[in-house]
């Protein structure tokens, strides 16, 4: 009987531990994305790597809205960079800088 109670207490303790690590992992993912953006310095290759973290965040219900909004911003920025390579460099660069600043300000 004592063993059964001890096992039940240990099992409930493990469940509590397992539940408390999930929010920590979620916040770590968001922190990882922010760190990725802050170190990307506008590099298209690095931003593409950040996109993979966003894809994981999209799967988490509590971060889905944030991830969707950031995905749009990142795609806008990537399209902006492509436009600078193919055409009106100076006019588009100002727009790119604006989009990049939005991304950075959301990840401080």
UniProtKB/Swiss-Prot annotation:
UniProt keyword annotation of ATP-binding present: no
Record lipid sites (N-palmitoyl cysteine): 17
Leader peptide range in chain numbering: 1-16
Bilayer topology: Lipid-anchor
A GO term from the CC aspect: plasma membrane
Disulfide bonds: none
Residue numbers with lipid attached (S-diacylglycerol cysteine): 17
Keyword tags: Cell membrane, Lipoprotein, Membrane, Palmitate, Signal
Pfam families named in the record: YbfN
Keyword Lipoprotein: yes
Protein name: Uncharacterized lipoprotein ChiQ
Organism in which the protein naturally occurs: Escherichia coli (strain K12)
């Amino acid at each position: 009987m004592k063993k059964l109670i001890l096992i039940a207490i240990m099992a409930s303790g493990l469940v509590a531990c397992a539940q408390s690590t999930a929010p920590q992992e979620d916040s770590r993912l968001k922190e990882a994305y922010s760190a990725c953006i802050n170190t990307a310095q506008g590099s298209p290759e690095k931003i593409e790597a950040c996109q993979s973290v966003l894809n994981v965040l999209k799967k988490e219900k509590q971060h889905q809205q944030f991830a969707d909004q950031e995905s749009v911003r990142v795609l806008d920025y990537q399209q902006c960079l492509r436009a600078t390579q193919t055409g009106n460099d100076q006019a588009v660069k100002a727009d790119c800088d604006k989009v990049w600043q939005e991304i950075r300000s959301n990840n401080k």
